[in-house]
């Protein structure tokens, strides 16, 4: 009897699915995307405005397609079990065409977690391929190819060869460039404060001492203004003989609510803040947790639900499991009477998806720690705690706000000081988890000082008045967390695009990281300026969000993809032709990037220039000084030991039988990691560690020994 064939994307997912399905099925992996638009040409029919794409099977997937085609002929039924989103639907469609699988044999199965229950339910309820989802993904791919292929030549002619533009990446770059312009234009404003220490009477050491700050002039609306030291000294002099008493005491109970379960963007943000994982690293590790890991007696099982989602929905079974766990672990007081639900705030969130959660609450992080590597454990621990905390009761605080009057001043003016204090009376979800905040964000003050018992009309002693000078601060640069948050809030891209977009900006040298924050390079600023001037629609945040909305409509069957592209392309085509004719070339000195390196010949700074053989370091004193040297080229891969960029280096002497070129950490000598073979951006499909190139077409993983063809780039959602 022929076995049914199940096709998934990766070997790890295939192993986990195979274990649950048993011997009547054979699960094989496509190793990701198998077809794409051709390299080196547009691959889209423009003459008749049908935008019909031409797809080629990727070179490194031809052998895999042949194997899948053979296996499909031997199978009675072929189940396409790729990921449960538009990209997964498109992969299934491409597999059907590339492997020439008869449609009558094919069934589509969808699951959001790789567990026995979820897989059994999916295979009991197969469906046909969803043409609307396929069309939405195809429209995205075609649109991004149109934008990338038409804009990039404009940059080559007006800025520098080898540059790229894209519908999502260019708008993300604009956010970084605009923020830098805000910072540069910011003018700090001086302001002053007066902090004070008060004591109950009679004084008894530090007992009954608390802090307050001047707030207002009685009878005058708004906060008191102290723009400079002169005004502040006037107030201090006025307060010399003042007497103080409690005007009012206001007490209330305050609630602190838990954060919603993770969606893709919030997981990337929190993993950066708490774990210092890049968005890309977070998604690699989350993929491992989703596809399945061996956890002892359970065998291989998916530990979390699908990690590309913008929905905060949680399945009823998981909610019930969380409530039961909370009651048994923390007590009934910590579990609400009914499940907590969180409203969707992301534009176009796909409600069929779930939030990112553990597939079993009972699989506590510490119980499976020995089966996970450090990165896997830390991310799983974060996801598990976030979900459980989201189903716990609020933390409760007794908050007190005290108004203190200052009378008897020399000018007759009466001032108001304010003090606040807060005491946690019930930990609630904080017994397990507390969300971090972005760098540069205003911290949420809990007013944590413990105020003494105070009564209205009670006299107080002022122990000291401390003036303080302050200056307003510019908006902070974006971190990975805050940039992902901005992309999400403004509807730029989708969960699958956040990580590759950030990686593209770095790899193209459009931005650099300065103490963990994104700063645009001169090149990035020049590219943004040119594109914003000549392609205002493409660079408009609202336009990008509108496109995402239209893609959502296509996915929902409310719109056809060809008319959407026709509406976009004609004005875009005119803008490209006009820019090629009218745009001025960007002067070289506006894109030459300054460096910290000093010229060995004359002592002037070295700058990064571009020549016919690529980028290099040149003395800024050229042509008086002609000193130049090779530039360390980033290879687009993070150092596995410290997370810095890996760069290409040259050894001073070549060892016999070895090339002088090797690849080392840019953080040398602090980090000494190095390899002789070129690191590849795609992780090992077996263990997700680093792959290196072996010759022109093969790859190898030093960690697990995997060998296979070099994977082709699969960042299909972001135009390059």
Segments predicted by a language model, with ranges:
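C-terminal or mid-to-C-terminal helical accessory/interaction module adjacent to the motor/catalytic core
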Residues: 114-196
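Metal- or metallocofactor-binding catalytic centers and their adjacent structured scaffolds
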Residues: 220-260, 458
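Conserved short loop/turn motifs at secondary-structure junctions
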Residues: 2, 83-84, 160-164, 251-260, ...
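C-terminal helical "lid" subdomain and adjoining coupling/linker elements of P-loop NTPases
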Residues: 158-162, 177-228, 274
């Amino acid at each position: 009897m022929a076995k049914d064939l199940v096709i998934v994307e990766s070997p790890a997912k295939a192993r986990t699915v195979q274990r649950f399905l048993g011997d009547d099925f054979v699960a094989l992996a496509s190793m990701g995307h198998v077809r794409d638009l051709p390299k080196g040409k547009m691959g889209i029919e423009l003459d008749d405005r049908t935008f019909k794409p031409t797809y080629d099977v990727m070179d490194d997937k031809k052998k895999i397609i042949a194997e899948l085609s053979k296996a499909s002929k031997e199978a009675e039924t072929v189940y396409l079990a790729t990921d449960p989103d538009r990209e997964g639907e498109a992969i299934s469609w491409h597999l059907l065409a590339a492997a020439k699988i008869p449609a009558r044999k094919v069934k589509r199965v969808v699951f959001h977690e790789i567990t026995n229950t979820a897989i059994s339910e999916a295979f009991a309820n197969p469906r046909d391929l969803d043409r609307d989802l396929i069309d939405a993904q195809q429209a995205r791919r075609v649109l991004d190819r149109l934008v990338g292929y038409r804009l990039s030549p404009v940059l080559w002619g007006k800025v520098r060869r080898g540059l790229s533009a894209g519908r999502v990446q260019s708008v993300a770059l604009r956010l970084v460039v605009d923020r830098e312009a805000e910072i540069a234009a910011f003018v700090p404003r001086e302001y002053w404060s007066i902090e004070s220490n008060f004591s109950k009477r009679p004084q008894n050491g530090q007992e009954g001492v608390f802090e307050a700050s001047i707030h207002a002039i009685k009878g005058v609306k708004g906060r008191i203004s102290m723009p400079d030291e002169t005004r502040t000294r006037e107030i201090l002099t006025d307060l010399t003989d003042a007497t103080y008493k409690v005007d009012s005491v206001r007490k209330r109970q305050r609630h602190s609510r838990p954060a919603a379960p993770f969606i893709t963007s919030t997981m990337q943000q929190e993993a950066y803040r708490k774990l210092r994982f890049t968005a890309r690293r977070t998604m690699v590790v989350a993929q491992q947790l989703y596809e399945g890991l061996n956890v002892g007696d359970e065998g291989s099982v998916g530990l979390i639900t699908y990690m590309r989602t913008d929905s905060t929905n949680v399945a009823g079974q998981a909610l019930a499991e969380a409530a039961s766990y909370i009651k048994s672990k923390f007590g009934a007081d910590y579990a609400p009477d009914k499940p907590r639900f969180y409203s969707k705030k992301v534009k176009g969130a796909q409600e069929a998806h779930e939030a990112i959660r553990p597939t079993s609450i009972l699989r506590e992080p510490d119980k499976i720690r020995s089966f996970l590597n450090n990165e896997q454990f830390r991310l799983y621990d974060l996801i598990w705690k976030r979900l459980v905390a989201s189903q716990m009761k609020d933390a409760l605080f007794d908050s007190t706000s005290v108004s203190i009057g200052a009378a008897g001043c020399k000018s007759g003016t009466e001032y108001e000081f304010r003090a606040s204090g807060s005491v946690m009376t019930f930990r609630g979800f904080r017994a397990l988890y507390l969300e971090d905040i972005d760098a540069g964000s205003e911290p949420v003050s809990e007013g944590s000082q413990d105020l003494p018992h105070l009564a209205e009309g009670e006299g107080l002693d002022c122990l000291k008045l401390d003036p303080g000078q302050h200056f307003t601060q510019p908006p902070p640069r974006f971190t990975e967390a805050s940039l992902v948050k901005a992309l999400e809030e403004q509807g730029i891209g989708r969960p699958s695009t956040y990580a590759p977009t950030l990686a593209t900006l770095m790899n193209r040298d459009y931005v650099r990281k300065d103490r963990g924050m994104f700063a645009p390079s001169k090149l990035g600023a020049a590219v943004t300026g040119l594109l914003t001037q000549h392609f205002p629609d493409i660079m408009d945040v609202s336009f990008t969000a509108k496109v995402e909305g239209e893609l959502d409509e296509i996915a929902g069957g409310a719109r056809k993809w060809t008319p959407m592209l026709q509406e976009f392309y004609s004005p875009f085509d005119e803008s490209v032709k006009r820019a090629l004719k009218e745009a001025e070339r960007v002067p070289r000195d506006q894109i030459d990037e300054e460096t910290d390196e000093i010229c060995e010949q004359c002592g002037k700074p070295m700058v990064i220039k571009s020549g016919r053989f690529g980028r290099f370091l040149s003395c800024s004193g050229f042509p008086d000084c002609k000193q130049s040297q090779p530039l360390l080229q980033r290879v687009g891969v993070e150092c596995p030991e410290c997370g810095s960029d890996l760069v290409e280096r040259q050894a001073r002497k070549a060892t016999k039988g070895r090339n002088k070129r090797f690849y080392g950490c840019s953080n040398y000598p602090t980090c000494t990691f190095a390899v002789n073979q070129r690191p590849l951006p795609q992780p090992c499909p077996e263990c997700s560690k680093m792959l290196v190139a072996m010759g022109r077409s093969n790859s190898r993983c030093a960690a697990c020994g995997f060998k296979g063809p070099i994977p082709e780039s699969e960042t299909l959602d972001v135009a390059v």
